[in-house]
Amino acid sequence: LSANTMAEDVTTMLAGELEFDPPADDYIGVVNVVGTIQEQTQSSVLDTSSGYQHNTTMDYIDNLMDDSDNKGILLYVDSPGGAVYESEELHDKLVEYKETTGRPIWTYMAHYAASGGYMTSVTGDKIYANKNTVTGSIGVIMSGYDMSGLYEKLGIRYVSITSGVNKDSSKLTDEQVAIYQSQVDECYQEFVNI
């Protein structure tokens, strides 16, 4: 295929509201992972102005799996990472694509392929990166704000009535910090084991 024909075919495949209209001949599907990996709303995976679209991307990969004319995936990654759930689900979907179809994935890492972007990239049979690509940075973070001082200064009193000791996490106890740390450690270990 010429570059123009391939670009037109990719545009045709991805244009419209989740419309999957692949070319009549063999083709390589392009999966864009651009921006923060989390669920957002948009109608086309070609439109990267709003960032990565999780459900749209997952549906697109399902369509590629079902299409015998598809001969592989070019995975374009330009992402600093994102949510643990969506990153791991995307990784697992790409692994499923390879295992189900036996077709290859080629990964191209652009500006960033860090954290969840790295997790996604490692599904490639071949990985290509620019010499200036920022990659790696595997890790998991959970954070929040302690606004108690501000509330006190403004005269705002927080009241919480719960059905269990660990239901309210607005004023973290040592036990709750340990629980959250255990969850972060577990997610990190899953990441390392990929």
Where are these regions (language model features)?
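Small-residue-centered hinge/linker elements
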Residues: 1-103, 112-194
